[in-house]
């Protein structure tokens, strides 16, 4: 997370140097969702003379993520958002009673910056993602136990000379590999180096 924090500081300095009006950088926020008071801290609010104030999230990204996910825009992220960036952005915006502006994304290898703008008409998305967040909070706060983890492992597949070869091994779902609770869901998993 240190790289991400440093990237956020650099972006804020660049915005200030470019005379872009900002407010509430790294401000605490809270929202009652799913019957719980969920707290966080948003990255920044940009005050655009045309669009007004909107909540933006700053992301540091690998070159792959920068070019293959964020560069394709908001709609592409809706199709594949394993880390919940859309839920996160709409939660921060809702906590301030504002629209979600989108992401300011920095390629942490090259330093390139891109703005990935959320659509102006976002009420349907807002409702959808706030609903997903409420469901997740309610599930986490209940006394449920998994009959099986919510995300299932994937078959390991190698491609050799254009032919797919399945090894018979299972791999954790991509979302699970980054999760701090993976050992709870997958206590018998073995990590090979």
Regions of interest found by a model, annotated:
Residues 73-95:
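Short, charged, amphipathic alpha-helix that recurs within catalytic cores of restriction-modification
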Residues 11-15, 19, 93-96, 137-140:
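Hydrophobic, Leu/Ile/Phe/Ala-enriched alpha-helical segments that form helix-helix packing faces
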Residues 37-39, 84, 171:
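A generic fold-level signal
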Residues 1-55, 62-69, 175:
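Metal-dependent nuclease catalytic cores that hydrolyze phosphodiester bonds in DNA/RNA
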Residues 68, 79-81, 95-193:
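Metal-dependent nuclease catalytic regions and adjoining charged, substrate-binding loops involved
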Residues 58-60, 105:
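Residue-level recognition of conserved beta-strand positions in structured domain cores
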Residues 8, 92, 179:
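A residue-level signal for conserved active-site and pocket-lining positions in enzyme catalytic cores
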Residues 9, 87-90, 173-174:
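Non-catalytic, well-ordered alpha-helical scaffold segments
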């Amino acid at each position: 997370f240190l790289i991400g924090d440093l990237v956020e500081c650099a972006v804020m300095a660049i915005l200030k140097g470019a005379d872009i009006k900002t407010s509430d950088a790294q401000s605490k926020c809270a929202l009652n969702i799913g019957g719980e008071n969920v707290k966080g801290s948003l990255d920044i609010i940009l005050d655009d003379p045309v669009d007004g104030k909107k909540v933006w999230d700053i992301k540091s990204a690998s070159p792959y993520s920068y070019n293959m996910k964020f560069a394709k825009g908001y709609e592409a992220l809706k199709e594949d958002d394993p880390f919940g960036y859309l839920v996160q952005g709409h939660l921060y915006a809702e906590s301030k009673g504002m629209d979600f502006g989108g992401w300011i994304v920095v390629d942490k290898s090259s330093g390139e910056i891109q703005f990935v703008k959320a659509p102006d008409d976002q009420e349907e998305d807002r409702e959808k993602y706030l609903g997903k967040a409420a469901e997740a909070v309610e599930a986490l706060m209940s006394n449920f136990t998994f009959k099986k983890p919510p995300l299932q492992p994937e078959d390991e597949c190698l491609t050799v000379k254009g032919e797919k070869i399945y090894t018979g091994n299972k791999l954790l779902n991509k979302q699970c590999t980054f999760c701090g609770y993976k050992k709870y869901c997958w206590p018998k998993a073995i990590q090979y180096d």
